[in-house]
Structures are given as structure tokens and as C-alpha cells.
């Protein structure tokens, strides 16, 4: 099977690979598994990218960008199963990965419950759950939001004396999965978050707590001020805590 040339999808998604490319990767893997003699096989191609920024005590601490890709293959030989994965999308790498999964399956003990679902249990429709809302966030914007969150926590009460930092993360991913009994499907999703961990009190009486907001859509995140204040209130509530008597 000829593998299509990956083309960059629209800038709206930010992904490096389009779904048709993933479909072809998966179909290539499944076809090779059957060629080797597999009873059944499943494969999933995925890609993710994102940005994470952390600050502490009013200073930028870390900026991390990630972009990952993977093809995972599961091969069944009777009731025996083998798994292998690769981040190399070349045809040769795909065939090596399938071969590795097949070899593992051949020498693995049988599992009476291993196998793919029956036809009547396979999903044939995929509702749109509105899970994908990419966030075109720059590192400067992320740092500004994190600093605002930490500042809000520190300004809540004079008893908030320190901070373990605040962070902002924007993550996007998509995948396509299929197996030899007919299932085909996949979707894109996003997960964005904002968090902070303030410290209340001094010396041996210091207490730490944290709070966060995590949403599919960045517009639905709680404000930096709200997250910071609530995290501070949680830390303050721990001051002068004592053990409850068992009696």
C-alpha cells in the first residue's frame, strides 16, 4: 500500500499530519499484520503538540514546547497478543514495528479473553462531542497569565508568604484508530489548564495548597484571579490545623 505524503493541515489545527495520512499509516500496518499471518490486528496513529509555561515568585521559570507522534500496533495470533510502537512513520519502520508485535504475540502465553470485540459490539457512529478547541497561545501570553494567577494568590492575604509557582498549559492532539474487524474512527481534542500553589504561614507552621482550572476550551477557564484567590484560601484554611481526637 502506498503511503501518502503528509501535508500540513490548516493553521487552525496546528497539526503536522492530516487524518488521511493517519488512515493510510494504520491501513498499512493492518495489511502487513495480516500478511505475516496475524489472526487480527489493531493500530492507532496519533499526534500531539502543546506549550507549558511555569513561573515562580514573579519570575519566568520554564518554557516547554512539545510535539509528539506515535504509531501503536497490537497483533493477535489466536489468543496471544503482542504490542509495539514507533515514532518513525516510514514504511520500513511500520513493517518492523508490526513484525515486532507479531513476534511478541507468537511467544506470549495465551490469554482466554484476549481479542477484538465482536461485530455487534463495534461502534459504527461517532457523535461530535465538541472536544477540540486549539489555543494559539504564545509563551509571553502564557507567562503573563501565570504571573497574574500567582500575584492574585499572593495578594489575597498577608499570611500568604510564598509560592511554589504557577503554570499554564495548552495541549492539542488527534488520533485515528482501526482494527481488522471493521472499526475505524478517531477525533481531535484539546486540554488547557491554569494552576498555582501558594504557601501560607511561616516556619514549622507553613501550609501549602493549590488549585487549578482545566477545560477543553481556553475561553471557559476560570480567570487567573479566581484561581489564585481560591488556591490562597485553601492554603489559609490549613493554618493552625490539628488532628481530630479519635474519641
Model-derived features: positions:
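Active-site bordering "gate/hinge" segments
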Residues: 1-247
